[in-house]
Amino acid sequence: MKNNVQLLMPREKMLKFGISALTDVELLALFLRTGTRGKDVLTLAKEMLENFGSLYGLLTSEYEQFSGVHGIGVAKFAQLKGIAELARRYYNVRMREESPLLSPEMTREFLQSQLTGEEREIFMVIFLDSQHRVITHSRLFSGTLNHVEVHPREIIREAIKINASALILAHNHPSGCAEPSKADKLITERIIKSCQFMDLRVLDHIVIGRGEYVSFAERGWI
């Protein structure tokens, strides 16, 4: 009963001021709904964020890390993984249905939702039309912990198939550091040169790390 009373506070705050007015602790408490024995839901939410450092650290953690926190079991872990997956699917649908002229921020958020937490390097391409509206996106290549083999010819073939005019390249670094390697720069140059022959523009190559990213366009490399 105490947990339910405590939970009314963030709910009432949300109804009065909007969901964005909630703190990270209050927002997490809404999803958790109940606390544990001797610990109300707000206290539990606060302790979880302190243990994992942030919402990002919490939602990208693995069950082994959860099992070391008192009062957090498989049910809470499943709830939080469900939240993370819901966010990922939301961005997926948003990209398909809104398909506006992409802002750098929206592109980055979408790619982070798709690639963060992957244990292997994944190379993605967002395909756009002549107005830079999204046609589709695809995970074209999958590799190992620190390498992914990328074939420009396959990228061009896919672009021609769907009549794309521009591309945004992206891949993740499971190590967490988003700084591009020499190999990343070389393959980007190869893709750009190959695309030029087919009148395809490469707008950016974004590398996703753990809580950070690097944009080739922002660095002036494209």
UniProtKB/Swiss-Prot annotation:
The keyword Zinc applies. One of its GO terms (biological process) is proteolysis. InterPro entries: MPN (IPR037518), RadC_JAB (IPR025657), RuvA_2-like (IPR010994), UPF0758 (IPR001405), UPF0758_CS (IPR020891), UPF0758_N (IPR046778), UPF0758_YicR (IPR022820). Zn(2+) binds at H171, H173, D184. GO terms for molecular function: metal ion binding; metallopeptidase activity. Keywords: Hydrolase, Metal-binding, Metalloprotease, Protease, Zinc. A motif (JAMM motif) lies at residues 171-184. It comes from the Bacteria. Residues 100-222 form the MPN domain. Pfam families: RadC, UPF0758_N. Belongs to the UPF0758 family. YicR subfamily. HAMAP family: UPF0758_YicR (MF_00018). This is UPF0758 protein YicR. It comes from Escherichia coli O81 (strain ED1a). The lineage of its organism: Bacteria, Pseudomonadati, Pseudomonadota, Gammaproteobacteria, Enterobacterales.
